[in-house]
Amino acid sequence: LAEEAGGQAELMPFDVSVQAEVEAAVDNWQDAHKEDYIAVLVNNAGIRRDNLMIFMQDDDWNNVLNTNLNSFFFLTRRVLKNMLSKRWGRIVNMASLSGIKGLPGQTNYSAAKAALIGATKALAQEVAARKVTVNAVAPGFIATDMTKELPEEELKKMIPVGRFGKPEEVASAVGFLVSDEAAYITGEVISVNGGLYT
């Protein structure tokens, strides 16, 4: 898809929740691209392990926080040095309506995404002087594998536009935030949720 759009892409399989794998993957990429740096980072990893808090297992809590929050820390810290030294970078973190509103049965997911929003706002202030922007996109209910088991017809009644969003609509928001036109936007959370607010 990237090549069809005139860009280039590489697949780098690794587990974003494991710090050693993140370090190795980024080191390998940097070794193969000595003149380049990762100028745009979209922290898009996410999993859900929904359950009421009283029934939630330790693994359900830890796996969600490791994938949704710790991966942000591992990857962002690793690529940030080059962004700062080159004085240009774009970081977009995929948050969620759950991180803004909090949803029952998703205490783990809501906690991870809310923390990601806080980290976005804090880091944006740390790196703005070096022309690195840090923003978040908070999707609502988007038609993906992650939402296919949810009761869509019931949920659509709560969404003012009356439908689930499309992945392309989320991608458009991300595309704007990584563009030169968004250079004066940092520390923001853009909701893509069809008008579903708290």
Language model features by range: what are they?
Residues 128, 133, 185-187, 193:
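Short, small/polar-rich loop/turn modules that mediate ligand/substrate recognition or access, typified
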Residues 96:
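Residue(s) in the substrate-gating loop at a strand-loop-helix junction
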Residues 13-25, 58, 168-169:
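The beta1-alpha1 cofactor-binding region of Rossmann-like NAD(H)/NADP(H)-dependent oxidoreductases
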Residues 54, 101-107, 129-130, 162, ...:
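Active-site loop immediately N-terminal to the catalytic Tyr-X3-Lys motif
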Residues 38, 52-53, 60-65, 147, ...:
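Substrate-binding pocket helix/loop in short-chain dehydrogenase/reductase
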Residues 81, 125-129, 183:
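Alpha-helical segment proximal to the catalytic Tyr-Lys
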Residues 76, 112, 120:
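Active-site helix of classical SDR
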